[in-house]
């Protein structure tokens, strides 16, 4: 990796400003999922162990550029204190950063931690405003980006601030880039991509980029119906993107030209309605009637996908196989998760829904890597440059 990493910086006695991703779900003041906080602990602990003065910043939710108490990071400071076993000073300012906040950063002693208020309380954050970036930079001597999940966005707290301070990536971002980068650039083969989710339009860039890299693509989720319909088959009232039929057809043709095997589902779990109560059954792809829709891949498809997964040496999975939030349409997604774990391959799970699914299936610790970025991991798989990483100092 050609970017500076945390270990390239001398952090002793320095104020280090770290962009973390503490965008966690909070219900009635209680954090319901601490994964993103956990993901940042390696970097924070390293800084404490090396006598740095630690200043943390993050966004939370979408307060639309103004202070809103329900989006305060105060509960996060309390939870982080518990998790790390030491006090985290929460500096609550509606302006996020002002003279008093800068003063607090100057009072910090080595090994102490402070967390500033939600960066999105300022509308300048999402505009990557130069003045706000400069204000943030006055909190510290060094800047570290450890928020992979926001690295596909160019905001003040992850891109703007890097123009004013020496910078590096933290351990979480480093791990994301190294693991996913190796999979894309130098994979052990056979290399299989499993793609799901509702829309082809969300995954076009990923498919186009992966056609030059993978040996096999397994397509599930509702996006499969657009591909199947592009071959002239009836899919009942299943979700399709009419304006993407020609594109789906051309992607299948491109795959054939490049010698990439694409597997589409051969059977589906179908029902008249997408509810827990609706009667569901498994049908073959040729047996669709106009009054039903597919909401999960069927048992034959699971078996075919599993056989391909077991042959693979590298696997990237992004997007669920069905509506896994509803129990009767969740089997495909959870069986694929189990199949990944059973394989002897390097297994990388993209962020967002796939990360939730792997966690829900109890297999989070049994795959090689679960990405912390939904949109960021998608854009990385598309081969796009991520601004939050691009701006970091070169080694």
Swiss-Prot record:
EC numbers: 2.7.2.3
Annotated signal peptide: none
InterPro entries: Phosphoglycerate_kinase, Phosphoglycerate_kinase_CS, Phosphoglycerate_kinase_N, Phosphoglycerate_kinase_sf
Gene3D superfamilies linked: Phosphoglycerate kinase, N-terminal domain (3.40.50.1260)
Keywords of this entry: ATP-binding, Cytoplasm, Glycolysis, Kinase, Nucleotide-binding, Transferase
Reactions mediated catalytically: (2R)-3-phosphoglycerate + ATP = (2R)-3-phospho-glyceroyl phosphate + ADP
Single Gene Ontology MF annotation: ADP binding
Pathway: Carbohydrate degradation; glycolysis; pyruvate from D-glyceraldehyde 3-phosphate: step 2/5
Main enzyme class: transferase
Chain positions recorded as substrate binding sites: 21-23, 36, 59-62, 120, 153
Gene Ontology biological-process annotations: gluconeogenesis; glycolytic process
Location(s), subcellular: Cytoplasm
Superkingdom in the source lineage: Bacteria
SUPFAM superfamilies noted in UniProt: Phosphoglycerate kinase
Annotated ATP binding sites: 203, 294, 325, 351-354
Annotated GO CC locations: cytosol
Keyword Nucleotide-binding: yes
Subunit structure: Monomer.
Family: Belongs to the phosphoglycerate kinase family.
Listed HAMAP family: Phosphoglyc_kinase
Stated name of the protein: Phosphoglycerate kinase
Source organism (scientific name): Finegoldia magna (strain ATCC 29328 / DSM 20472 / WAL 2508) (Peptostreptococcus magnus)
Taxonomic lineage: Bacteria, Bacillati, Bacillota, Tissierellia, Tissierellales
Recorded name of the encoding gene: pgk
